[in-house]
Design a protein with these regions (language model features):
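Amphipathic alpha-helical polymerization modules
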Residues: 1-140
Length: 140
């Protein structure tokens, strides 16, 4: 595996973690939203990753070098919490308001995990860059 593959692999991870952070941001932004006129509340989105062999992306001879890609973004189908508040403008006929199914604590943990993974891959790129520069300096 060449050093340039390190950058490509880390870049796939950065892209994937960025999408994960976007989903977390969307989930947290909608954590306290209620069902709309259609009766449907916001559903938390989850990002699923899949291994991506770099040989499949056009790199010859590096079939065992694996990056990552987003395979799917799904909506959590668990029902949102229902609160009895008959005076709320979004209350149904029984006086219940349906909120999103976002668990803010889980989302914060997910955000910390995605952020750390993103930072780790930046560190991988910085280390690879430093090694390449040192290799070039040895040739002088």
């Amino acid at each position: 595996m060449s050093m340039t593959n390190v950058f490509q692999i880390a870049a796939t991870a950065l892209t994937a973690q960025s999408m994960r952070l976007n989903a977390v941001a969307s989930n947290l932004a909608n954590a306290d939203t209620v069902a709309g006129p259609d009766g449907q509340a916001y559903k938390a989105r989850q990002v699923t990753f899949q291994s991506q062999l770099m040989g499949q992306t056009g790199q010859i001879g590096d079939a065992d070098a694996a990056g990552v890609k987003v395979s799917n973004i799904t909506e959590d189908q668990t029902p949102g919490r229902r609160v009895h508040d008959p005076k709320h403008p979004s209350a149904d006929a029984d006086g219940y308001v349906t909120y999103s199914n976002v668990n803010a604590v889980e989302e914060m943990v997910n955000m910390i995990s995605a952020s750390r993974s993103y930072q780790n891959n930046i560190e991988v790129m910085n280390t690879a860059k430093s090694l390449l520069l040192k290799t070039l300096q040895m040739g002088q």
